[in-house]
């Protein structure tokens, strides 16, 4: 990077940093994944424990990640962390996986849910190609907003996050509303929580870990403060504050909202949800009629919009950092001459995400056994589980090789905190190889489509590094 190359500006304060964590974490999962959980573990106590466990798991990650990120408050996030901890190949592979799989698939999935909610609100029937075109147009508009400036994008993120948190609080307060204003028939009932515990049939570990894969998607995004850390003011203070405060707020909202869902809807109703609907929409339809369903669809749109916007804000900073290190085309490090944003990186990410919308729509229409949303989210989680766990475990490396570095924040509970965190992803990843169900007397492996696709992309990335990136990065700068 040349000395006269313009740099990113530190314009994000503590409120904007917290909004980044909360806004990119709360997206579609709290609305969409309740159905997936009911298919794997149709017992209220188990489901509630999974949501609480997901929060504890994420909090353990945040406790560790806050120390690691505060050591490297630079654009790139995990790219910089993995490169410094394990070597340049691992930094590149994270960038490759994040671009090709995690970030782009997440953006495609979120834009798809935004489109579904839009058509649901306005009751528009539309063929698949029309939905795909609308989904891509959403990505294009979001990319344009992010090109226009970091401060503008961050201010929009704070506003959207405030609205989505308020919406979730309103949903969480449904039981309280009917307690204060009872009516007949009262949609809220403790009997809806049955069955609370599994009976003789029990729940297998495979079912629990498959269910936890859905939980991982719902909590995914809390680490998105890392790629924009170069733009956070006083990062050693504000990044730990954003991570710990943001994760705590998200966990409280998730547990409260899902309790409200189950107090309103019996488990059988959730398990047999109409195609194209969500638990949130049906719960509010039962509670407040068509007006409630309309509110739920609007809340989903706003929530997904915020997560989509935050991810499109964070993702290009990784490509920008890779361009600086010559592990991606160097043009990606160029900033817009007026708005001082990584405009080319934003454009490239939006184009690839749009391509995944088309590919995912094609795979879904050809009957791969998953909805477009579930296919994209499970695909994203495969790469995320591997590399984000490596980033958490890098704390052991940095405690050794950077023992004397200034640490304004130190991981609470070290070394047990990162070790406990790493156990769950290892189990979830292993379960992706073996989880199965019976269809017409035949064993069908639940996650093999996205698993093998992920392994192929990871293998391609390894070849790209050794054949192209490593030789290119060793050439002297002209």
What positions do the PLM features span?
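Membrane-interface "cap" regions at the ends of multi-pass membrane proteins
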Residues: 1-46, 58-59, 63, 74-75, ...
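Hydrophobic transmembrane alpha-helices that form the core helical bundles
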Residues: 36-39, 58-139, 144-147, 152, ...
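Helix-loop-helix junctions that connect adjacent transmembrane segments
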Residues: 3-8, 47-48, 125-130, 162-297
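Transmembrane helix-loop boundary segments of multi-pass membrane transporters
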Residues: 38-46, 116-131, 151-160, 295, ...
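Helix-loop-helix connectors at the membrane interface of multi-pass transporters/channels
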Residues: 1, 79-83, 111-134, 167-170, ...
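Membrane-interface loop-to-helix entry segments
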Residues: 130-188, 220, 243-247, 380-390, ...
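C-terminal membrane-solvent junction of multi-pass transporters and transport-like membrane proteins
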Residues: 332-340, 385-437, 445-450
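TM-loop-TM module centered on a large, flexible mid-protein loop between adjacent transmembrane helices
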Residues: 80-81, 87, 120-124, 196-198, ...
């Amino acid at each position: 990077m040349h000395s006269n190359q313009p740099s990113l500006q530190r314009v994000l304060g503590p409120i904007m940093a917290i909004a980044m964590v909360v806004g990119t974490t709360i997206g579609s999962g709290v609305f969409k994944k309740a159905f997936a959980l009911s298919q794997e573990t149709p017992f209220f106590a188990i489901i509630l424990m999974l949501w609480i466990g997901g929060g504890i798991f994420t909090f353990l990650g945040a406790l560790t990640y806050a120390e690691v990120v505060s050591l490297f408050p630079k654009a790139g996030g995990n790219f910089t962390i993995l490169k410094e901890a394990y070597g340049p190949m691992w930094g590149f592979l994270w960038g490759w996986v994040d671009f090709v799989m995690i970030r782009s698939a997440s953006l495609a999935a979120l834009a798809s849910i935004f489109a579904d909610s839009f058509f649901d609100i306005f009751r528009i029937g539309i063929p698949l190609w029309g939905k795909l075109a609308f989904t891509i147009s959403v990505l294009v508009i979001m990319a344009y907003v992010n090109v226009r400036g970091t401060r503008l994008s961050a201010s929009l993120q704070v506003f959207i996050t405030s609205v989505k948190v308020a919406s979730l609080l309103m949903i969480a307060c449904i039981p309280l509303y009917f307690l204060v204003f009872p009516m007949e028939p009262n949609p809220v009932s403790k009997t809806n929580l049955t069955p609370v515990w599994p009976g003789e049939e029990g729940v297998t570990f495979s079912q629990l870990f498959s269910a936890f894969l859905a939980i991982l998607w719902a909590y995914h995004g809390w680490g998105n403060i890392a790629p924009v850390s170069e733009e956070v003011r006083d990062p050693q203070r504000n990044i730990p504050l954003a991570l710990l405060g943001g994760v705590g707020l998200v966990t409280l909202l998730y547990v409260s909202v899902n309790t409200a869902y189950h107090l309103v809807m019996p488990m059988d109703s959730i398990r047999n949800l109409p195609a194209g609907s969500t638990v949130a929409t049906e719960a509010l339809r039962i509670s407040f009629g068509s007006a409630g369903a309309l509110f739920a669809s609007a809340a989903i749109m706003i929530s997904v919009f915020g997560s989509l916007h935050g991810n499109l804000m964070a993702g290009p900073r990784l490509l920008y950092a890779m361009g600086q290190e010559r592990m991606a085309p160097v043009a990606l490090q160029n900033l817009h001459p007026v708005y001082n944003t990584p405009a080319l990186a934003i454009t490239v990410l939006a184009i690839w995400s749009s391509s995944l919308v088309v590919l995912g729509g094609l795979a879904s229409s050809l009957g791969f056994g998953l909805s477009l949303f579930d296919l994209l989210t499970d695909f994203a989680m495969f790469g995320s589980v591997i590399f984000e766990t490596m980033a958490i475990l890098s704390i052991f490396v940095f405690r050794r090789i950077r023992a004397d570095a200034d640490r304004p924040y130190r991981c609470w509970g070290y070394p047990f905190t990162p070790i406990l965190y790493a156990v769950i992803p290892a189990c979830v990843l292993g379960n992706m190889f073996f989880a199965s169900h019976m269809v017409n007397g035949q064993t069908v492996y639940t996650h093999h489509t996205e698993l093998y696709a992920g392994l192929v992309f990871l293998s391609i990335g390894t070849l790209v590094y050794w054949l192209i990136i490593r030789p290119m990065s060793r050439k002297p700068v002209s």
